[in-house]
């Protein structure tokens, strides 16, 4: 049933939050970062009267998926972190909740393929590393990211 599914989802979110709070290593890319946020802001619809889809609450921001806030963000990305040069790509329509965006601080500057700065942040909270960037793992030592 929907009620059982919701309860199981709440348990899973609590387990993820406890794992992150206890220092567990989490690399959250795009949808993973959204899952770790406080919630997803939605438009009301005929299917739901809720305007917020609650998430795990590990990271201190909301993500907007409201029609008025949606815009396509895509491209190749690169940045340096913990002595490694990381490359990847970004593709999403969701955005950080506009009221909180100014207070979010990235742990590094992210660049596009032409080495021009972009506004994509990379967050670090305890052993959680999160960003919209999907990383290419073939040339990096993932465990060094958590040092």
Where in the sequence are the language-model features?
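Single conserved hydrophobic/aromatic residue that forms the stacking wall/gate
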Residues: 1-8, 12
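Catalytic nucleophile loop
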Residues: 17-39, 134
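Short hydrophobic-aromatic micro-motifs
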Residues: 28, 88-91, 128-133
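Acyltransferase
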Residues: 120-147
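Feature representing long, continuous alpha-helical segments
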Residues: 14, 31-34, 54, 117
């Amino acid at each position: 049933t929907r009620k059982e599914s919701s309860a199981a989802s709440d348990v899973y979110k609590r387990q993820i939050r406890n794992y992150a709070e206890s220092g567990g290593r989490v690399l959250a890319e795009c949808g993973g970062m959204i899952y770790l946020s406080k919630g997803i802001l939605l438009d009301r619809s005929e299917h739901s009267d809720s305007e917020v889809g609650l998430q795990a609450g590990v990271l201190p921001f909301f993500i907007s998926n409201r029609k008025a806030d949606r815009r396509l963000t895509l491209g190749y990305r690169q940045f340096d972190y913990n002595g490694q040069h990381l490359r990847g790509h970004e593709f999403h329509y969701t955005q950080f909740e506009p009221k909180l965006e100014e207070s979010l601080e990235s742990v590094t500057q992210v660049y596009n393929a032409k080495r021009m700065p972009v506004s994509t942040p990379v967050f670090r909270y305890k052993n959680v590393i999160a960003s919209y960037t999907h990383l290419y793992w073939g040339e990096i030592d993932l465990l060094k990211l958590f040092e």
